[in-house]
From Swiss-Prot:
DNA binds at H94, R113, R156. A zinc finger (FPG-type) spans 241-281. InterPro entries: DNA_glyclase/AP_lyase_DNA-bd (IPR015886), Formamido-pyr_DNA_Glyclase (IPR020629), FPG_cat (IPR012319), MutM-like_N-ter (IPR035937), Ribosomal_uS13-like_H2TH (IPR010979), Znf_DNA_glyclase/AP_lyase (IPR000214). This is Formamidopyrimidine-DNA glycosylase.
Length: 281
């Protein structure tokens, strides 16, 4: 599933193609993805000018001037690509939503597994929308620091890995970047969340910020479906320290792979966790 860096990469790529442009045509090519597509989506977006394109957690917020906000989630396999209308290939079977601009560009929302979604919200009540209302702070914003993290983890005895995947604790984090951040901070994924305080919390916040920033700069991680808006792959997967590297040497210490087995894998809440048992405490 695309995590914060992948969604932010898509936002950055779509912004010059959409913001300030009028939508000359919008097409919904099926009635539903994960949720039903609003029956008035085409009518309410066609002819509108895009005022801004923001991100909240793993959601894209396409804001119209004098119009609604389109909330988009890429689901497990979704991507959004930009191309010229002239000479553009016919939409494929997995190209479900099309946005065409008066400037002659088409943005295609493709989602083979159909776990993504698009819906509409009113700008005045956007923060109270059911998909957004309970989200935690953005980890790259000034609203997120060690004090905030400690407060949100207070009283939680669940493992820190599970707590960080809770979108109500911190918004936008997923399995890849939580594993990578915990490794950088030297924190075991099994450690009780409420015990991450003081210098540990400072280290974790710094690690989260660093990992996310580096991943965005690399265009995200392309393990299966993620593509940038020009169709290019992200390449942060080549810089993983622990994720999907079971049995390989740990880059943070002098692990003896023959003795320790290298990077380990375990399953937490149905998700694979990768870590170094020697480095992370």
């Amino acid at each position: 599933m695309p995590e914060l860096p992948e969604v932010e990469t898509v936002r950055l790529g779509l912004t010059p193609a959409l913001v300030g442009e009028r939508l000359s045509r919008v097409a919904a090519r099926r009635p539903a993805l994960r949720l039903p597509i609003p029956v008035d989506l085409v009518q309410r977006l066609t002819g509108k000018v895009v005022g801004s394109l923001d991100r909240r957690a793993k959601y894209l917020l396409l804001r119209m001037i004098d119009g609604p906000v389109a909330l988009i989630h890429l689901g497990m396999s979704g991507s959004m690509t930009v191309g010229p209308l002239a000479g553009h290939a016919e939409p494929g079977p997995h190209d479900h939503i099309l946005f065409e601009t008066e400037a002659g560009l088409r943005v295609t929302f493709r989602d083979p597994r159909r776990f993504g979604l698009i819906t509409l919200a009113e700008p005045e009540t956007l923060d109270d929308h059911p998909l957004l209302a309970k989200l935690g702070p953005e980890p790259l914003s000034e609203a997120f620091d060690a004090e905030v993290l400690v407060r949100r983890l207070n009283g939680r005895q669940a493992p820190i890995k599970a707590a960080l995947l809770d979108q109500g604790v911190v918004a936008g984090l997923g399995n890849i970047y939580v594993s990578e951040a915990l490794f950088r901070a030297g924190i075991s994924p099994l450690r009780p969340a409420a015990s991450v305080t003081g210098a540990w919390a400072e280290a974790l916040v710094a690690a989260i910020r660093a990992v996310l920033g580096e991943a965005i700069a690399a265009g995200g991680s392309s393990l299966r479906d993620h593509r940038q808006t020009d169709g290019a792959l992200g390449y942060f997967q080549h810089r993983f320290a622990v994720y999907d590297r079971v049995g390989q040497p740990c880059p943070g210490c002098d692990c003896d792979v023959a003795r320790t087995g290298g990077i380990e894998r375990m399953v937490q809440s149905g998700r694979s966790t990768f870590f170094c048992g020697r480095r992370q405490r």
